[in-house]
Regions:
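Juxtamembrane intracellular "pre-TM" segments in multi-pass secondary transporters
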Residues: 170-211
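Helix-loop junctions on the cytosolic side of multi-pass membrane transporters
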Residues: 104, 108, 150-183, 378-391
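Helix-loop boundary and gating motifs at the non-cytosolic
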Residues: 1-38, 199, 203-250
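Substrate-agnostic recognition of the 12-TM MFS/MFS-like secondary transporter fold
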Residues: 1-11, 34-48, 54-67, 83-142, ...
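Transmembrane alpha-helix termini and helix-breaking/packing motifs in multi-pass membrane transporters
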Residues: 13-22, 72-75, 132-154, 234-235, ...
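C-terminal transmembrane bundle of multi-pass solute transporters/carriers
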Residues: 41-44, 58, 62, 82, ...
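MFS-fold secondary transporters
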Residues: 19, 72-73, 91, 164, ...
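Membrane-helix boundary and inter-helical linker elements of multi-pass secondary transporters
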Residues: 20, 51-52, 77, 108, ...
Length: 394
């Protein structure tokens, strides 16, 4: 949670800073793309690494390394875009370990029957920092510059690493010491475990359906990430401060969505929650991108926070509920890679076609992708969830 606060401050400040000094969607998109490349190249492999390591200390080391990487920016002259891109790549390279390690540690510390509640609580805390993080980031950028955002992120990583080191984990989850093996044997075992994890996804119809649905949503999100900055600055005529407010409002919606998910979990089946929230995402996004009025965008973004949480958490929980624990890291490593690939494609489309086709047109296309996800997933997800409940999955 603490490192997430620094992340949000930094994530809001960086694209605004780059767009301010370059006025280019290509430059702004390059930052997002460079952050996705490590996830694409090493996401699934990172999951295999995590499965064979102590999850808690993996998270601690990742936070420390990311803090050191960001600190290097203070030794680079201001305005050097290449330096920001290089450090962003290094930071996200080690960061590929964080998601699979975090998901695996969560499963290791609670019962599977309480995963929905645990994930909902996690989302609530994540969205709480999302409320204050963007507003702080946008304001600090306007007042003190990008340096304060970097310093805040470094501080948050260091505090997070200390707190993670104090987490108590079951002895069965600690790193197991095995017999000595040769480097070649370890390498073959490493890639063998990674391949087995990918085969689980490819041969399980429910996992494949969920991954397909996520691919459309992350494609749309990649486009939005790049284009939302020029939309707010150019189309709406706002500043970094208002941009931070808009992102914070979505965090408020996320808090409400997490609370609603806790209440609806045992009353409403996963299928209608997922499909209805995806279709709502498309409608809300279309309205937001075609009515550039600040107050109206506030309202739409708040509702988008609600529907985003419901669809994403329920889809992720379906994976957690059914994946064998020894494959958990590998499955979410593959998920991390899928997210990176589809977001990278979306970011590339937005970066290179944004100035040619126009910001609003491409944002409308991204909104329609949410509708497509709901339509594609309607029959496939419903059928595979029925099969899964009857134990007929591959």
């Amino acid at each position: 949670m603490i490192s997430g606060l620094g992340d949000w401050i930094f994530l809001i400040a960086m694209p605004l800073y780059i767009f301010d000094i370059t006025k280019s969607t290509i430059a702004t998109g390059s930052m997002f793309i460079i952050q996705m490349l490590p996830r694409l190249l090493f996401g699934s492999i990172a999951g295999t690494f995590v499965d064979k390591r102590n999850k808690k200390w993996t998270l601690v080391i990742v936070d420390v390394v990311r803090a050191v990487a960001l600190a290097l920016l203070f030794f680079v002259p201001s305005g050097q875009l290449w330096a920001f891109l290089v450090i962003a790549f290094i930071q996200n390279l080690v960061g590929t370990l964080f998601i699979p390690a975090h998901r695996s540690l969560l499963v290791a510390t609670i019962s599977r029957e309480r995963l929905v509640e645990a994930n909902s609580i996690t989302v609530v805390s994540d969205n709480f920092i999302r409320i204050i993080g963007p507003s702080i980031g946008g304001t600090l950028l306007g007042i003190a510059g990008v340096e304060i955002a970097i310093a805040t992120d470094i501080f948050s990583y260091m505090i997070s690493s200390v707190l993670l080191s104090l987490v108590a984990v079951k002895s069965s989850q600690q790193k197991q010491k095995g017999t000595e093996t040769s480097l070649k044997q370890k390498w073959l075992e490493f890639w063998g475990n990674w391949w087995n994890g990918l085969k689980v996804v490819g041969t399980n119809h429910l996992y494949s359906t969920i991954f397909l649905m996520f691919s459309f949503t992350w494609l749309a999100q990649g486009m939005i990430n790049v284009l939302f900055v020029p939309y707010v600055i150019n189309e709406m005529g706002q500043t970094s401060v208002e941009f931070g407010w808009i992102e914070s409002v979505q965090g408020i919606g996320g808090l409400i969505g997490g609370y609603l998910l806790l209440k609806l979990n045992k009353k409403v089946a996963s299928f209608p929650l997922i499909i209805s929230s995806l279709l709502a995402n498309g409608g809300l996004a279309l309205l937001q991108f075609n009515i550039p009025i600040l107050f109206f965008v506030f309202i739409m973004n708040a509702f988008l926070g609600i529907t985003d949480v419901i669809s994403i958490v329920r889809l992720e929980t379906l994976l957690q509920e059914q994946v064998p624990e020894n494959y958990m890291g590998r499955i979410f490593g593959a998920y991390n890679t899928l997210m990176a690939l589809t977001m990278l494609i979306g970011m590339s489309i937005a970066s290179f076609l944004g100035e040619m086709m126009g910001t609003v047109m491409l944002l409308n296309i991204s909104a329609l992708l949410f509708f497509l996800t709901g339509i594609v997933g309607y029959r496939a997800l419903k059928q595979n969830m029925k099969v899964s409940r009857h134990g007929k999955n591959d």
